[in-house]
């Protein structure tokens, strides 16, 4: 039989062991979140990768319009003109007002009559009034505001013309810079290969050291051209980003191919559509219509005007529907015809003034028509020339690439000189750059032509 002291000591040891195990477990649980916290912090601190924004030309134009203060100003003017038209239309419709008045008149106890228009010492008026006025001036004002709204809309499209051409040129300049960078990389690789080739041939005693020097100079020139192409692409992307993004963003790519086949419409199609949708022509025509309505409105000053008023409510000594002698409610109606007689020639002056404006608007319309015909021929010739040259430039780029390959092979066989290879490399670089510039020229010329027909200027 164990002694009581041994039993007590055993229980103390067991309790101590349990306490130690519990402390270790608690320490492990505390350390686990602490070790997990830096992981979460690291994950939260890592910047999220935004998806690359693919931009079509229409997307770029829409974004540029939102960021252009000049275009937004013209849009605001067009919106204001639409509200003017709404207000002019509302002026032709009956209006309803509700009048409330309280009048106090001091009575004359001597019997003299004064303030005869007042009906009693205390008079209360609470009436609804329906008013309608009809005259030629108001009708002409509505028609004028309609023409002014069309004029403001056309001017908004005119304001966007320069913006459209700028965006198109910047958009395809980025595409051309990308193509030039790819060509510069190929030229750089070709320069490195040619330098390696001349070095190998020099070791074999087949060429002189001067060929190696010439190849190395050419290689250094190609590397400088590669750096310039990288800088050109960077500047083109920055200029384009400033133009279309409200907050600077360089994380984008172009969705349209610079060398995609875009047919040129016939000149008859361009002329037909320009006659119908050209913003300058529509603006000039709307200005003539507006001036014509001004003349009609000014001549309306010679004619009578008609107004009609209808009242319903109370006009009584008590502010109540029912008075001491019955109902205070009543109604009345008034029709008025105002006939102009004499105003010292002011109406004649306004008519003359409006006719002068109409004559000037007609002159500007004739000028816009002649200018449109000239611009169509000029811009169409520009686009047609650029398109015809583009096929030749494409062929030149292909031939220069093939010529470079063949010249390099001839140099390997000892049939060509190093100068011929260098000349072939230079020709290839120039032909490729000219091809990219020609593609941009055609796109810009086509955009200029499309602005005449309202294709790209209409949001």
Predicted features and spans:
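Transmembrane beta-barrel architecture of outer-membrane proteins
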Residues: 123-125, 169, 214, 330-332, ...
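A glycine-/polar-enriched beta->alpha junction
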Residues: 62-72, 79-95, 128-144, 154-161, ...
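Acidic, low-complexity, intrinsically disordered peripheral segments
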Residues: 2, 13-19, 26-35, 49, ...
